[in-house]
C-alpha cells in the first residue's frame, strides 16, 4: 500500500487527508526508518509495508467504528512502542487527547522527537510499566478509551488496560488472526477486571493475506483495587 493508495482508501471512509496530514505520515515513515537503524522500533521498514501494516492497521478501528472515538475523548495507548495505534489515529483525529504508556525510554525519546517534527500537540508520554501506571491515581480509570496492539495475550492485556479505562469507557485490542482462543482464555480475567466483550471483528488488510481481529470491550464496573498486580505478575500468572 503506497502513500497514494493509503490516502485513497481512507477517503472511502470519509477521511480525506489534508496536505498537512499526508506530510505527517511521510515524515513519520522517514523518521521511523531513520531511527530504527540504532533503536529497535520495528522489523518492517519497506514503505508500502509500513503504510499497510503500521499506519493502515492502526487506523482500522477508527475507520470501522468511528462512533467509539467521541469528540475530544481521552485515549490511552498501552505499550505503543513506535506509536501504534495511537499516533496514526491522532493524525486523523487531532481533537483526541492521547496518553502513551511505554516502559522503554528510548522509544519514548523517539516519540517525543517525532511529535515535535510532526507539529502534534495533545500527546502525553508516560514512562512506566502498565501495572504501575494502572495503580497511579492520576491515570487509573481516567480514560474513555484504552488501546493496545500486539502487546500480550488477551488475559494479560486485560489486566494492563482495563484498570485505566473509566467505568462506561472502552478497551480496544488490535489482535492477530487467532483472537478467539485468546478470548476464551481471557473470560475469567475480563470478568474480574470489570470488562465485557461487546464486539469482535475479523478483517483482512487490503491487498494482502494479513488477518487482524479487533476486540471491543466495555468497562461495565470498577476494577477491584488489587488489580493490576505488581509488575511482571500478570504475565507470569494470568488471571
UniProtKB/Swiss-Prot annotation:
Gene Ontology molecular function, alphabetical: rRNA (guanine-N7-)-methyltransferase activity
Keyword Transferase: yes
Chief location bin: cytoplasm
Residues binding S-adenosyl-L-methionine: 79, 84, 130-131, 149
InterPro entries: rRNA_ssu_MeTfrase_G, SAM-dependent_MTases_sf
One family name in Pfam for this protein: GidB
Subcellular location per the Swiss-Prot or TrEMBL entry: Cytoplasm
Key word Cell cycle present: no
Keywords annotated in UniProt: Cytoplasm, Methyltransferase, rRNA processing, S-adenosyl-L-methionine, Transferase
EC number(s) reported in the record: 2.1.1.-
Listed GO CC annotations: cytosol
Family: Belongs to the methyltransferase superfamily. RNA methyltransferase RsmG family.
NCBIfam families: rsmG_gidB
Function: Specifically methylates the N7 position of a guanine in 16S rRNA.
Name of this protein: Ribosomal RNA small subunit methyltransferase G
Organism: Lactobacillus delbrueckii subsp. bulgaricus (strain ATCC BAA-365 / Lb-18)
